Amino acid sequence: MLRVAWRTLSLIRTRAVTQVLVPGLPGGGSAKFPFNQWGLQPRSLLLQAARGYVVRKPAQSRLDDDPPPSTLLKDYQNVPGIEKVDDVVKRLLSLEMANKKEMLKIKQEQFMKKIVANPEDTRSLEARIIALSVKIRSYEEHLEKHRKDKAHKRYLLMSIDQRKKMLKNLRNTNYDVFEKICWGLGIEYTFPPLYYRRAHRRFVTKKALCIRVFQETQKLKKRRRALKAAAAAQKQAKRRNPDSPAKAIPKTLKDSQ
């Protein structure tokens, strides 16, 4: 917020400086520099400051088999005599001039014809998974351009969780259709964990303490093993050299007598 406010204030200052008072103009008017001639946009300062994070590169679609922009919309494909219409009208009724909703409808219909046996059945579990997948990919394309859009990120995560539940249900009921949908949509199904526990602060500290205690016990065991190995080595050395200094003393006494 502070960065946005600083940008707006700097833009307002530059705008105030450019409005120079000219005494020759009637009523003490002010002369402005030609912003349009230089390619600058003095208006909508808040929008310029707030949307500075938007990626300028066009978001690339992840679907390799996107329909061409010259295809007609779904409502006008079966109209009689549509081929004799002027090219301008065809362009207005094509995907090139359509909105995002119409594009998603065309993509969903394309996947339904490719994967599902009955494309007209839109209430089945497979059809709902396809509709969710198309929506998820549109959210991903939007987030590639608008990286800080938290609302669409939340919608994306919720849709992914919902699709996981549907895929799990479909896998338990009809495995062949499940494999076909995963192959057609390019989905890699991962199994959920058998046990999940939320890592709060007390759990994390307890786990770190247990790991530290385990490491210290391993160090103590290693030292005990080293001491035992040293004691065993000393015993073996004594067995190899049976002449001890206690036995050597009486021999010297006998020799002296």
Swiss-Prot record:
Record's keyword annotation contains Ribonucleoprotein: yes
Annotated localization: Mitochondrion matrix
An annotated GO cellular component: nucleolus
Highest taxon of source: Eukaryota
A molecular function GO annotation: RNA binding
Transit peptide: 1-57
InterPro entries: Ribosomal_uS15, Ribosomal_uS15_bac-type, uS15_NS1_RNA-bd_sf, uS15_ribosomal
Gene3D superfamilies: S15/NS1, RNA-binding
Region feature (Disordered): 225-257
Keywords from the named record: Mitochondrion, Ribonucleoprotein, Ribosomal protein, Transit peptide
GO biological process: mitochondrial translation; translation
Subunit structure: Component of the mitochondrial small ribosomal subunit (mt-SSU). Mature mammalian 55S mitochondrial ribosomes consist of a small (28S) and a large (39S) subunit. The 28S small subunit contains a 12S ribosomal RNA (12S mt-rRNA) and 30 different proteins. The 39S large subunit contains a 16S rRNA (16S mt-rRNA), a copy of mitochondrial valine transfer RNA (mt-tRNA(Val)), which plays an integral structural role, and 52 different proteins. Interacts with METTL17.
HAMAP family per record: Ribosomal_uS15_B
Protein family: Belongs to the universal ribosomal protein uS15 family.
Record protein name field: Small ribosomal subunit protein uS15m
Gene source species: Homo sapiens (Human)
Organism ancestry: Eukaryota, Metazoa, Chordata, Craniata, Vertebrata
